[in-house]
Amino acid sequence: MSVGYDRLKTSSLAELRAAIRSGAYRSHTAGLGQGYLQANLAILPEAYALDFMRYCQRNPKPCPLIGVSDTGNPMMFTLGRDIDIRTDVPAYNVYRDGRLDSVSADITEDWRDDLVVFALGCSFTFEHAVMRAGVALWHVDNDRTVPMFRSNIETVPAGPFSGKMVVSMRAVPEDRVAEVAEISRAYPLAHGAPVYWGDPAGLGIADIMSPDWGDPAPLGPGEVPMFWACGVTPQVAIEAARLPLCITHKPGHMLITDVAEDAEVPVVETAQDKR
Amino acid sequence: MSVGYDRLKTSSLAELRAAIRSGAYRSHTAGLGQGYLQANLAILPEAYALDFMRYCQRNPKPCPLIGVSDTGNPMMFTLGRDIDIRTDVPAYNVYRDGRLDSVSADITEDWRDDLVVFALGCSFTFEHAVMRAGVALWHVDNDRTVPMFRSNIETVPAGPFSGKMVVSMRAVPEDRVAEVAEISRAYPLAHGAPVYWGDPAGLGIADIMSPDWGDPAPLGPGEVPMFWACGVTPQVAIEAARLPLCITHKPGHMLITDVAEDAEVPVVETAQDKR
């Protein structure tokens, strides 16, 4: 039996996770589990894990690490009391040799004892804070995906992982730009402060209405385009590295954790019991 | 020729690093390289690096990771333009099989192609911010080492690394406690907000005047003991893991980086050129 988005919007975290785990809900997670941290996902063989972790440490704005599993253990015990990464994300992309091989609602069959799970913070957290401050975000109000661009900023490489930084764009009234930058800087686990604002040409972006990913968003009169480091950056780096196996969330279909959005550190109290 | 502390206090970063690299300066770094991030150090064989990095990610308050080297590469290119970790720390402790084997001003002879360097943020950064706000710190004013205690807080384990959290204590006037907590929370790369304040018994500390490390510090009238996660925590976890080889800085003798103390991310701009 499938469960609808509107009903889950008011569900408890436990009901929400049960609906996703059973496969009853397989759609996007924007607006669900409000108040809790959501995460991008990258699952890799252990042979690549140290280099990928170094890539995240060296590029903390596009790749804010919020959780790393033990090798071969699908339970993300630092992010929640009962999160099984094989079933608790609505939809997964499975890549083999750098190419998308399948899309699935359950990766139990793909799981291996040498896999390591990386959870990365996402932009929902700072967007909520910006909207609470009374700044409207066009893509949210119009139910579109935020526009994303390949920038001319080079990431700091680690092992096989490298590439240009992908950025997301949000248009903000000129007199709120400094305030929005300051608000987002307080969320280092959700990409932090913008990397740039103003003329898109400064990032090597020729046409602001032709994003490389997501939907185009208009610039209203008196609005300034602000650009944040984006979680698509590590996905592009992973694809370019052509790993034999890599599993990610399907874009927009995130892991919902037990960690409060305003937590200082992304570790639940029960994590200490898992010795 | 040795160089004195007082002269180096006003030296440029380049002069300071040259004096340390040549062995002319082998003493503590408190008050040197003002305005730049200083770091605790742990150098381990690659076989333990992924687990240690997971330990840091799971315990970000005692173990705030600010830099990780490539395996076998002694140049810390994300933390500075020209930092050679074999020579650029005033003094090192070399541990073999979990026991202190030697203290040295240069580890060029100990370097191996399988070593990975971890640099961790230290408390100097938030202490500077607290003092700028006009709150005096007794151990700084009296040229002592901050008192440190083994607490009853369990860290989140990863592989062979586990143990109790070590905390450092600073006495703060009751009416400044909330402000000091807020100031330090803004420095997640320097241990962040305190983990506790008030009656030391709550952390399992029997006698506040008998620290496990450092010097005792008095509690003045109207002062509250505040406790922060401490960088000795990973050193204790590493010692307990009895690694065949581990090299740390000698306590107080830190790595001085090129990263500004108030930088949003601990990565210098030239890091991108090191592909």
Curated annotation (Swiss-Prot), chains A, B:
Biological process terms in GO annotation: glutamate metabolic process
Name this protein carries in UniProt: Putative hydro-lyase SPO1111
UniProt record similarity statement: Belongs to the D-glutamate cyclase family.
Annotated source species: Ruegeria pomeroyi (strain ATCC 700808 / DSM 15171 / DSS-3) (Silicibacter pomeroyi)
This protein's record includes keyword Lyase: yes
Enzyme's top EC category: lyase
Transcription listed as a keyword: no
Keywords (A to Z) from UniProt: Lyase
MF term (GO), any: D-glutamate cyclase activity
NCBIfam families on file: PRK05463.1
